Amino acid sequence: DGALLAHILSIVATAGIDDRDAISRFLSKTFLASQMESETLEMRTDDVLHWLCENGMIDRTGESKQVKKRIKEMKTIDAEEEDWQDEMPSWANSASAIPGLDLIPKEESRTRRLSPRRGPAIFGFKKASMYEPSESFLPEPSAMTYSPTPLGSRVSRLYLNPISGRIIQDGLRKAMGIVSGEDNVGQVSPLSLLHLASCTPDFLPLWPRKNDYDAIQEALHGHERELLSTPVDLEEERRMKGTLVVHSWMDEDSLETIENDWGVQAGDLRSRVELLEWLLYAMRRILSEDESLARIDRGAHKTLFESIDEVHRRVRYGCKVDILGLVAIKGVGRVRAREMSDTLGVASASDVSLMTEGDRSRLSDLRGWSPRLVDKLVDSASKSVRRSR
């Protein structure tokens, strides 16, 4: 239950509600409590707390004497509030005094007499030996207290589904093993990081068309070494299609090409780009704040961080690595950046700020350009260079 996982992690990590009894009291006042039985809600809450503890989002910090005292006091207050007065109401007493008006006791309902059964006395049950044993957890003590881990706090502040946070951290740990040389089979590429983010429940996958399956299967098998995780819902084709579409975007394929190749229109592409941009940002933050991953290999940790940052910027701007320095200039998108790179060979704001009059003239002669636009971009590049000093 991703929603309940996120909400309980949030109230433990940020709301100061950090014991089992307080969590129950908080949830009992929510709309969810009106939609299910209290016992069911308590069981689901225990399951969620167990999952969060087992997956490194929160820690159990022991039973609190203060919480036990508070629970005892609250039980006394609740008992006083539930002291029912089961006496006859005043209106009934008044009505009974009216001549000719009697209170008639409710008669027992008559049941239809059934004929003797013809089948067995008991049916529809399985023998106990036929059931498969299932893992069960003891209920959390009411006085148990919890504290968020660094991972849990970060996941909560990033508004991630805790399952997404767990998938990302596991994938990053695998990537660290590859980059550090501990794993000599796998490889890390831009597609690896895109696919890791797309495997989370926070990503919205794309439905593959019939003619998409060959390309998707080819990618699944051809990039097998690069995959850092498996999809949360085992729908590999849908999530790989989302990965490949965004990969085409950051390889500078046009919107028309992406629509023709994948049947994905601009609005759907934009929504997936924004989701992956957010998830890659979250991935970068989780990696930077996870000291256990940094201790594996500081050099590999830095390399992986820089790789995620590069892919994040490529997804944001929809471009290849060589023009990342140009798209960061105000007013320069990926199309203009590519034209500047192909025409003049510039690659950074510093190069643009040093353009000669001849370079400016060549650029302004291109279709869609003008001397005024070129001067404006040179001014923006110069300001960017001054700010970076």
Language model features with spans:
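C-terminal helicase lobe
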Residues: D1-H50, M57, S96
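Alpha-helix C-terminal capping/helix-coil junction sites
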Residues: C53-E54, S341
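Intrinsic disorder
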Residues: G2, I17, E39, M43, ...
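C-terminal helical "lid" subdomain and adjoining coupling/linker elements of P-loop NTPases
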Residues: E37, E63-Q66
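C-terminal helical accessory/scaffold domains
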Residues: D46-V48, E54, D78-R334
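Accessory alpha-helical DNA-binding modules that contact the DNA backbone or grooves
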Residues: G299, I308-R389
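Long C-terminal interaction/binding lobes of large macromolecular proteins
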Residues: S28, R285, R336-R338
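Short beta-strand "wing" residues that participate in macromolecule-binding interfaces
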Residues: R60
